[in-house]
């Protein structure tokens, strides 16, 4: 019926947030707990979840979500949780707690063993989906600031489910030739919507390059293109910006995003605001990078602030016309090696709502000047 139905603006997407209880503001948007709860409650056939790791029992709200998943699985709803091979620390406990949930570990880069499953998304019944930076952990559901998008528009959910099929093909328990055959089957039909064919002003982008499939957009290409074409403003809220790629303990310079930010500020006079995280999960290069941007662009309209509470929000807004929400840092290792899906939109309402979130965070008491 989709070809004959009008496409709703923004593909029925709503912003979703987790805000820790110790923050000095609240959100008007759906909470991550409410989003996951709704997906589970409305599911009739299946729920597919992709996350680097799975540790929902670490907080009360996370445990409630996992208990609801357990109840759904006991009613016959098919539940599959994809985890990265290196993120399965709590797998035994979860399997014993709920044997009806199918946990599958994946290795998206068996050849070099450097890539991780970094994507955070849920899909149910080809009807509802979530994509953002909330992994399936108690912290992301309750105590760590995150941002994502929920939609109950079936065409968009179906398109995200194709990504799940791709990642699932890299089941670490299977032989390599089975992985390759499975991937070959799912990649040619990997997407219906992309930068040249968004649906309701919405499309997904993907990483890494070897998982793109037919007509998918490489996330790096889209992000850099938007940064390079920025005319008036760039707002970035990220855990980290790291212009390096790490392989086997060695670091290599990867300046693509870093240079695009500097060029926008110095060459084109674009107003840039950068809000970075500052907690123990930060790369050691993160604060050095923030300080270098601040110093290099001291004569330009570039401002840097540090968010003092655990903040895993990863948000980019360009010219108040485009929004990008992802699970990856602006980090060479993430963009060159890891598997993830990002949300993109040019829908005016969605961009406006994301902008309000950035403005709220930027002026909050939790945002401190880098110079303090």
From Swiss-Prot:
Enzyme class (EC, first level): hydrolase
The chemistry this enzyme catalyses reads:
a 1,2-diacyl-sn-glycero-3-phosphocholine + H2O = a 1,2-diacyl-sn-glycero-3-phosphate + choline + H(+)
What function does this protein fulfil? Major envelope protein that plays a role in the biogenesis of the viral double membrane and in egress of virus from the host cell. Produces the wrapped form of virus that is required for cell-to-cell spread. Acts as a lipase with broad specificity including phospholipase C, phospholipase A, and triacylglycerol lipase activities.
Q: Name where it's found.
A: Virion membrane; Host Golgi apparatus, Host trans-Golgi network; Host endoplasmic reticulum membrane
Covalently lipidated residues (S-palmitoyl cysteine) read 185-186
GO terms classed as biological process: viral budding from Golgi membrane; viral budding via host ESCRT complex
PTM note says: Palmitoylated. Attachment of the palmitate moiety is essential for correct intracellular targeting and protein function.
Induction record: Expressed in the intermediate phase of the viral replicative cycle.
Provide the family line. Belongs to the orthopoxvirus OPG057 family.
Q: Does the keyword Isomerase apply?
A: no
What is this protein called in UniProt?
Answer: Envelope phospholipase OPG057
For this UniProt record, give its keywords in alphabetical order, as a comma-separated list. Answer: Host endoplasmic reticulum, Host Golgi apparatus, Host membrane, Host-virus interaction, Hydrolase, Late protein, Lipoprotein, Membrane, Palmitate, Viral budding, Viral budding via the host ESCRT complexes, Viral envelope protein, Viral release from host cell, Virion
Question: What are the residue boundaries of the PLD phosphodiesterase domain, all occurrences included?
Answer: 307-334
* Subunit relationships: Interacts with protein OPG190/B5.
Organism the protein comes from: Vaccinia virus (strain Western Reserve) (VACV)
GO molecular-function term, one example from the UniProt record: phospholipase D activity
Q: Name one GO cellular component term.
A: host cell Golgi apparatus
Q: What's in the domain note?
A: Late-budding domains (L domains) are short sequence motifs essential for viral particle budding. They recruit proteins of the host ESCRT machinery (Endosomal Sorting Complex Required for Transport) or ESCRT-associated proteins. F13 contains one L domain: a YPPL motif, which might interact with PDCD6IP/AIP1.
User: EC annotation?
Assistant: 3.1.1.-, 3.1.4.4
Q: Does the keyword Mitochondrion apply?
A: no
Q: What is the lineage of its organism?
A: Viruses, Varidnaviria, Bamfordvirae, Nucleocytoviricota, Pokkesviricetes
Q: Its membrane topology, per UniProt?
A: Lipid-anchor
Cross-referenced Pfam families: PLDc_3
Q: Per its UniProt record, what InterPro entries does this chain match?
A: Diverse_PLD-related, PLDc_3, PLipase_D/transphosphatidylase
């Amino acid at each position: 019926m989709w070809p004959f139905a009008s496409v709703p603006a923004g593909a029925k997407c709503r912003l979703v947030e987790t805000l820790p209880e110790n923050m000095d503001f609240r959100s008007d948007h759906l909470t991550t707990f409410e989003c996951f709860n709704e997906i589970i409650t409305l599911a009739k056939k299946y729920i597919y979840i992709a996350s680097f790791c799975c540790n929902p029992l670490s907080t009360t709200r996370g445990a409630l979500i996992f208990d609801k998943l357990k109840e759904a699985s006991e009613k016959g709803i098919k539940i599959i949780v994809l985890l990265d091979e290196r993120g399965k620390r709590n797998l035994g406990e979860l399997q014993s707690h709920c044997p009806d949930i199918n946990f599958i570990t994946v290795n998206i880069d068996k050849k070099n063993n450097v890539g991780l499953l970094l994507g955070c998304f849920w899909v149910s019944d080809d009807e509802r989906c979530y994509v953002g930076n909330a992994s399936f952990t108690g912290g992301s559901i309750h105590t760590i600031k995150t941002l994502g998008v929920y939609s109950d528009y079936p065409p968009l959910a179906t398109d995200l489910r194709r990504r799940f099929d791709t990642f699932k093909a890299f089941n670490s328990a299977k032989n390599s030739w089975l992985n390759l055959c499975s991937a070959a089957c799912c990649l040619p039909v990997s997407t219906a919507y992309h930068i040249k064919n968004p649906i309701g002003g919405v499309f997904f982008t993907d990483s890494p390059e070897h998982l793109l499939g037919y007509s998918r957009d490489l996330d790096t290409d889209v992000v850099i293109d938007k940064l390079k074409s920025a005319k008036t403003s760039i707002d970035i809220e990220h855990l980290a910006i790291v212009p390096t790629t790490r392989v086997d303990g060695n670091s290599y310079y990867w300046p693509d995003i870093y240079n695009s930010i500097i060029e926008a500020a110095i060459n084109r006079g674009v107003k840039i605001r950068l809000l970075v995280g500052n907690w123990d999960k930060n790369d050691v290069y993160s604060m050095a990078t923030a300080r270098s941007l601040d110093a290099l662009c001291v004569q330009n309209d570039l401002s840097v602030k540090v968010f003092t509470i655990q903040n895993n929000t990863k948000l980019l807004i360009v010219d108040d016309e485009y929004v990008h929400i992802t699970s990856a840092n602006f980090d060479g290792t993430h963009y060159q090696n890891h598997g993830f899906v990002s949300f993109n939109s040019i829908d005016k309402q969605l961009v406006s709502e994301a902008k309000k979130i950035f403005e709220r965070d930027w002026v909050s008491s939790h945002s401190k000047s880098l110079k303090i």
